[in-house]
Curated annotation (Swiss-Prot):
PANTHER family: LOW DENSITY LIPOPROTEIN RECEPTOR ADAPTER PROTEIN 1, PHOSPHOTYROSINE INTERACTION DOMAIN-CONTAINING FAMILY MEMBER
Biased amino acid composition, Low complexity: 189-201
Protein name (record): Low density lipoprotein receptor adapter protein 1-B
PROSITE patterns reported in the protein's UniProt record: PID (PS01179)
InterPro entries documented for this protein: Adapter_Engulfment-Domain, PH-like_dom_sf, PTB/PI_dom
Pfam families per UniProt: PID (PF00640)
């Protein structure tokens, strides 16, 4: 079974994803079964890409919309004649964090709640792109990245979609707790009861985590290729050494909460991030192979085909 096809079905069919505690630690390899490691996605999955650029768009989602935006970005990148910037893209339920590969300097941190669409472009099939609402002026921006191969662009897209499902569950809990606090008002007893209810619900969600992260039947097959015998895989999934993500209760500011609610209204299904991938797109004899994801340099022959995607 094609790995990407299985992963795609899992994103569509998987049950509600329970909340987990955020962890840190040293680098480590993935286990034989990726679905056994809850922290893998929660702590962030890393992808080595090349940044093509950004352009403004008028709508939060749409295949034709994103295709036009990507075409414009690629044309601008070609015209500039500049070497593409190598970047490290970290995907987690908190969002997309972009680092410069050479300096490790933070370029951008986009909350998952501001992302309205992502896709592996049809025309330029090595390009991954996402649309997000700007934090500064609330305009909609389409950002595009060049991957080493088409399967990698699809893998990044599916990873962002899966991260969104986790984030949506966090958002629901945050909203529920916020509503309880508002109802309890300034009454001490009410506040205590609200806190107890919140803790109880989170404990219950954590208890069911191992069973609900992904659809086991499909995703066990989909991620069998991500196993500890692959010497390259540990370089792709580096855990954050800080404890910045240890708190599983996310407090959203009113602006972000409103932005997410507004973007949710534009989705086909508010609980699922719209992606420009279909079952037909994922049908291929080529399996998702992470061994080439960490390929940073193009050989001379490939360099001439930099924009021939």
């Amino acid at each position: 079974m094609d790995a990407l096809k299985s992963a795609g079905r899992a994103i569509i069919r998987s049950p509600s994803i329970a909340k987990q505690s955020w962890g840190g630690g040293k680098h480590k390899k993935l286990p034989e079964n990726w679905t056994d490691t809850r922290e893998t996605l929660l702590e962030g999955m890393l992808f080595h890409l090349k940044y093509l650029g950004m352009t403004l768009v008028e709508q939060p989602k749409g295949e034709e919309l994103s295709a036009t935006a990507v075409k414009r970005i690629v044309a601008t990148a070609k015209a500039s004649g500049k070497k593409l910037q190598k970047v490290l893209l970290k995907v987690s339920p908190r969002g997309i964090i972009l680092y410069d590969s050479a300096s490790n300097q933070l370029i951008e941190n986009v909350s998952i709640y501001r992302i309205s669409y992502c896709t592996a472009d049809k025309m330029h099939d090595k390009v991954f792109a996402y649309i997000a609402q700007s934090q500064q002026n609330e305009t909609l921006e389409c950002h595009a990245f060049l991957c080493t191969k088409r399967k990698m662009a699809q893998a990044v897209t599916l990873t962002v979609a899966q991260a969104f499902k986790v984030a949506f569950e966090f958002w629901q809990v945050s909203r529920e707790n916020k509503d309880k606090r508002e109802k309890s008002g300034s009454d001490g007893e009410g506040a205590s009861s609200s806190q107890s209810d919140g803790s109880s619900s989170i404990t219950s969600l954590k208890a069911s985590a191992s069973a609900n992260l992904l659809d086991f039947e499909d995703c066990t097959k989909a991620f069998d290729v991500l196993n500890a015998s692959d010497n390259h895989i540990e370089d792709l999934f580096r855990q954050n050494s800080t404890n910045e993500n240890n708190n599983i209760v996310w407090e959203l500011d009113d602006g972000l909460d409103e932005a997410f609610a507004r973007l949710a209204e534009s989705r086909t299904n508010p609980q699922v991030l719209d992606i420009g991938l279909t079952a037909n797109d994922l049908q291929s004899e080529e399996c998702l192979s992470p061994t080439s994801w960490d390929k940073l340099e193009l050989n001379p022959a490939e360099a001439d085909e930099l924009f021939m995607f």
